[in-house]
């Protein structure tokens, strides 16, 4: 029977293998296709540190996450450490490539090794599926996987070059808050348009907070309805076995600040910032009323108002950014009314002169 297996692996079905389905299997297949939560609870298996390979016994919040992924195009979730978030996401991605033909999924993380580890978890779960639920294997390695139904899944780092030119039906971004701001910005500018061009494509962003960065902005915008992301958050106490005693022990073994960020999921600013994190969190920001390239304008110039422009220029060699902000100082509190940020302009860009003529 080894001829029915992919490269002799008895846990993987070979392309072209015929399966004689029973009536019960057909009904079960259709049930799994329609309900990703049922599929995960019934057929996904994971590795337990104590018991080896065991069924994935989902907690309520994990079921809610999968339902949100299934029902919404754009998802962002803020979760504590060690809540099974990776296994939950992998379960949904496996369901997606199994029951949808000719789709591409990208598993992306701040490190290539992390993305490949996630793909490895998906492959482990795949090998535990019964043969009648599997698709035949076309490609199966540490970095990618392709099924007989034409669906593919790729593990890569979140660099613009890693996935440039590719099209994805789902992009899963793991621990997005730990990706440097400039890399996240480049990544979205190169890959995000391919997602938004579709009508059923999805973005899933999962992370524990790591300061007040790009993930923080996406999260706040989602909560305030400024973007199209459905948002989910999980408190550490929702994980069985985590109580006040567990919290006390964890803080004793780490620190109060570490617990607050990694388990309470608070967005903490750096201790070295000029403005305190508590103040940064209460500051408001609005969408620009006009945008022209790298220039965002939040208020049009008002006659007889006083403005200042703060400028920080670079060499214009596509490395550091040239930037300036325009601030209305007529009345307290002062307001930022325009900003500019670009790394491809020459020293003392002409746009600075134009903005100065309007506001000063």
Model-based region annotation:
Residues 103-124:
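Conserved Walker A/P-loop ATP-binding site and its immediately adjacent core
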Residues 124-128, 134, 178-254:
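ASCE P-loop NTPase helicase motor core
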Residues 72-93:
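Walker A/P-loop
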